Amino acid sequence: MKNLVSVIIPVYNASKTIEKTIKSVLCQSYTYFEIIIIDDWSTDNSFKIIEELSKSDSRIIIYRNQKNLGVAKTRNVGINIAKGEFISFLDSDDIWKCSKLEKQLEYIKQKNADICYTSYEMINNNETNSVLRVAPKEINYNGLLKENVICCSTAVAKTSLLKKYPFQTEFFHEDFVMWLKLLKHEYKAVGIQESLVIYRKGGRSSDKLKACRNRWIVYRKSEKLSLILSIYYLINYTLNGVKKYYFC
């Protein structure tokens, strides 16, 4: 449907945060959206919270996996369900600012872009120690190989592209791999430097050695880069990580 935004929220054991996350979508100044919430077989009361919230707004569509599939497959379920011209992803513990969708859709049209991401504020589970991550105005394939500047909860992309290039479930950094595929095909990705998302760091990416190993696998097996290029991009990734987490 033209101009409709399909907001995809995968949920797994997010009872402490999911209500606030959903309400941050419902507060949007741009109101022509559907919220597709897929519960990935949560063992807490996340699904009950989602069911209750869905009664208050017909734009909320809920779905429950019959077993735990993981975030990549769960997002792909949402992509298959989506009816909108655009898809926007939101993790179940992150929060949007109320002007996010409106500003991104305007910017996509202004720049004739396929993907739009934004700056974001990174907080811990106690919602303290906010750190601003400023998005570059534009990113291409080679730039993304050095550093993944597209935080998934900030992104809006054309649905047609995501249905063609969904998340690849064999890689741990599934969102990074998907953005790489899109940019490799020269789709245009632009960034809004205003912070429009609050990203909860939590325990994600806490194992830096594992993250480096997974990034190496992406370079070699997904992107099939040479040994020299893989080393070059891994060094850039590591240096950017040190700068991001220890000097900001």
List each language-model region with its residue ranges.
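Cell-envelope/extracellular polymer assembly enzymes that use nucleotide-activated donors
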Residues: 3-6, 24, 34, 177
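Glycine-rich, basic loop-to-helix element that forms the pyrophosphate-binding segment
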Residues: 65-82, 103
